[in-house]
């Protein structure tokens, strides 16, 4: 569960390493976001020479959360960290590589490009 002011690692090679959540998109007054949801973030840490710089305001989709998500068959999936992938307005990733596993719920949210780039889908 990602709230406003939550910090997340970035799981792609767009140049950002850590982001801070500004706003959860999808409805007025929405407080929390989970896997597959889009959030507006600002870049707090970045690598030199990357596509995005420190201080940039970007949109990102959440790919891993510590709190996890419940699936329809009753199982839960949790990860060791909160992570996101920076996306463009057309929901395509800004980076060309994805690091670490991503949840299968991204397939339901129509982020097929992220699922295809990921090394492992859990």
Swiss-Prot record:
Any one GO molecular-function label of the UniProt entry: large ribosomal subunit rRNA binding
InterPro entries to which the protein is assigned, alphabetical: Ribosomal_uL14, Ribosomal_uL14_bac-type, Ribosomal_uL14_CS, Ribosomal_uL14_sf
Keyword 4Fe-4S: no
Keyword Membrane: no
GO cellular component, one term: cytosolic large ribosomal subunit
Alphabetical list of SUPFAM superfamilies matching this protein: Ribosomal protein L14 (SSF50193)
Record keywords: Ribonucleoprotein, Ribosomal protein, RNA-binding, rRNA-binding
GO biological process, one term: translation
Segments passing through the bilayer: none
Subunit-level organization: Part of the 50S ribosomal subunit. Forms a cluster with proteins L3 and L19. In the 70S ribosome, L14 and L19 interact and together make contacts with the 16S rRNA in bridges B5 and B8.
Function recorded in the entry: Binds to 23S rRNA. Forms part of two intersubunit bridges in the 70S ribosome.
Family per similarity comment: Belongs to the universal ribosomal protein uL14 family.
Protein name, per record: Large ribosomal subunit protein uL14
Protein's gene: rplN
């Amino acid at each position: 569960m990602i709230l406003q002011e939550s910090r997340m690692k970035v799981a792609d090679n767009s140049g950002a390493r850590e982001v801070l959540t500004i706003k959860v998109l999808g409805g007025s007054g929405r407080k929390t976001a989970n896997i597959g949801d889009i959030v507006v973030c600002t870049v707090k840490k970045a690598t030199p020479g990357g596509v995005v710089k420190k201080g940039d305001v970007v949109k990102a989709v959440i790919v891993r959360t510590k709190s996890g998500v419940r699936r329809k068959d009753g199982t839960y999936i949790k990860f060791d960290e909160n992570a996101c992938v920076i996306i463009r307005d057309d929901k395509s990733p800004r980076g060309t590589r994805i690091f670490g596993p991503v949840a299968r719920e991204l397939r339901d949210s129509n982020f097929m490009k992220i699922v295809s780039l990921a090394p492992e889908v859990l």
